[in-house]
Amino acid sequence: MKKRIPTLLATMIATALYSQQGLAADLASQCMLGVPSYDRPLVQGDTNDLPVTINADHAKGDYPDDAVFTGSVDIMQGNSRLQADEVQLHQKEAPGQPEPVRTVDALGNVHYDDNQVILKGPKGWANLNTKDTNVWEGDYQMVGRQGRGKADLMKQRGENRYTILDNGSFTSCLPGSDTWSVVGSEIIHDREEQVAEIWNARFKVGPVPIFYSPYLQLPVGDKRRSGFLIPNAKYTTTNYFEFYLPYYWNIAANMDATITPHYMHRRGNIMWENEFRYLSQAGAGLMELDYLPSDKVYKDEHPNDDSSRRWLFYWQHSGVMDQVWRFNVDYTKVSDPSYFNDFDNKYGSSTDGYATQKFSVGYAVQNFNATVSTKQFQVFSEQNTSSYSAEPQLDVNYYQNDVGPFDTRIYGQAVHFVNTRDDMPEATRVHLEPTINLPLSNNWGSINTEAKLLATHYQQTNLDWYNSRNTTKLDESVNRVMPQFKVDGKMVFERDMEMLAPGYTQTLEPRAQYLYVPYRDQSDIYNYDSSLLQSDYSGLFRGRTYGGLDRIASANQVTTGVTSRIYDDAAVERFNISVGQIYYFTESRTGDDNITWENDDKTGSLVWAGDTYWRISERWGLRGGIQYDTRLDNVATSNSSIEYRRDEDRLVQLNYRYASPEYIQATLPKYYSTAEQYKNGISQVGAVASWPIADRWSIVGAYYYDTNANKQADSMLGVQYSSCCYAIRVGYERKPNGWDNDKQHAVYDNAIGFNIELRGLSSNYGLGTQEMLRSNILPYQNTL
């Protein structure tokens, strides 16, 4: 598990940039114009075996002890070159040593260069036996990469393993600019361990020191090393001034952590954000524990709560062991329902409505797999805390294909549902689903005939409170058996478009499906995990109307659809359009009186859906989709976007998204009852844009307008300045952050962020547009 981290002071001094860099275009090319390159043929092999060539105006010697070269002295060996006004070579016999000690003194305008570094100074010294080297009062400049500095004394030791600087400095800024630099009384760089030790380290902006540490051990190279990361700051209306100072801890080869003290002025305390990553035989995972010891704002707003501590715990794990065992964890829990309203966090959002806590262990071999899992939900609504958890759930699949012309499958599930409230129904559900398929296909079409049996048993408990308040009663023991029959046929027709577009190919792909499921009254079964599934074009051909198993709607229907695609001469899809409908011969029912459209007794063409994509050119693209459901008496959902994209930094995108309140209520019934902001549905039009506005300046913006509420939904604006040695990013974001029940409108949070990045320490010379686009609450999605 390898990690490269740009530390706060890391990779200072020449040694920081010995790793090869890949350079982005434009700005990177401009920056490299100020960096010297190695223009001599690169020599491979052991330099000790290569000849030494010396040129000078004058030479004299006392063989074999001394030799003096003066006047434009130029010494070359392999890739190394030494120039000076005067060079003195000394050779002395050392007692007990088979070889004499050979040293060199260089005086006046000393210039040393190779394929990695250039050293300049008035005086230099070297031991030719050990390769130890000293340069006094020197400047250094990296070759082929950014990085330069000064030192009172620069020393090479341990066969060039160690570089030691006395009163040294480093910056990645080009000559003539010292916007930032790092200085230290002593700096030791170990190339083998890829670490730099700094004593009395000072980070300076211009001539002003802004950070001091008596000792720092910083990573240099690919090996992971502990150290401070680049700090960050922002201002929000929720927390006022915020400051982050992350620290990276390299614990072991298979685990590391990032510890971030996060100061929030309005909260009056520091939140400790701790991220831990690990790799084991059972898989890889990540844990996050955020802890705020006390929150004065929360304490004022919730005076009846015993504690004002705020916390989040997140655990994600995925792994395979012995090729047959699967382990997965997706666990998020917070201290209170308001947590994601008050704090930004990449592991959750205030718009989610709930947090999931799921553990699963699976076993899989050929033709068989089984999974045991538990799933719980933490609902963020303070008004409705009722939610069901699966404790536990067993899923089993057995496959046997090519049984003659048939494919077979048996799916089984056993689950126990528990509610967070002690007066709600609970149940144990056992489900068995044998399936047999007859797939037939050739080059131009396919038909799949499927028959299955849906057999489910419920053992429901804790029914007294519910039955006493509802006219429809739940039964303790319920058996439901339903056959299902489906025939799904597809064809693909293809033609050349020589008359209209030479080299282009068009396909026509009709599809038809018949589905039959008999009606079973399910009013005596409580709805534990079912909700309406979205009916986009591909969803029209599902065998189910609802997710889960508690509501299986009857069906006597034909679904028809057609897709047409156009490919260019390089087989790239340039255009597609899909349109489909479901025609009901009889009403689709479950017997649940809470599903309002079942009382309408509707048949005929009830559900329509369409999707389209048009890659107009290499820079223009369009996507759209719409779903109409007559059972909801409305367009259920729709979305559209058109985009101009010149490259990753230059793009403009227009969007529209819509979801009817009836659709939200049908698909998210429990969340809809408490999510006041969605009672009128979603109807938003917006734009996203990114463009360099001047040399080294780029701007990103996003704006969405709620046409239902006639007000701004959310917006974002970011500006970044990029240079060869630093980048500064300033951003503003306004986003919804909860609902005010008293005033009946959304609550918004305004955030201003500020970030500085040191350049020249990595291959990133980008304008920052992609990072700013992804930071929005509704992140940019590519249309092309």
Swiss-Prot record:
Biological process annotations from GO: Gram-negative-bacterium-type cell outer membrane assembly; lipopolysaccharide transport
Major place of residence: membrane
GO cellular component: cell outer membrane; transporter complex
Compartment(s) of residence: Cell outer membrane
Keywords: Cell outer membrane, Disulfide bond, Membrane, Signal
Keyword flag Signal: yes
NCBIfam families attached to this UniProt entry: PRK03761.1 (NF002997)
PANTHER family listed in its UniProt record: LPS-ASSEMBLY PROTEIN, LPS-ASSEMBLY PROTEIN LPTD
Protein name per Swiss-Prot or TrEMBL: LPS-assembly protein LptD
Gene that encodes it: lptD
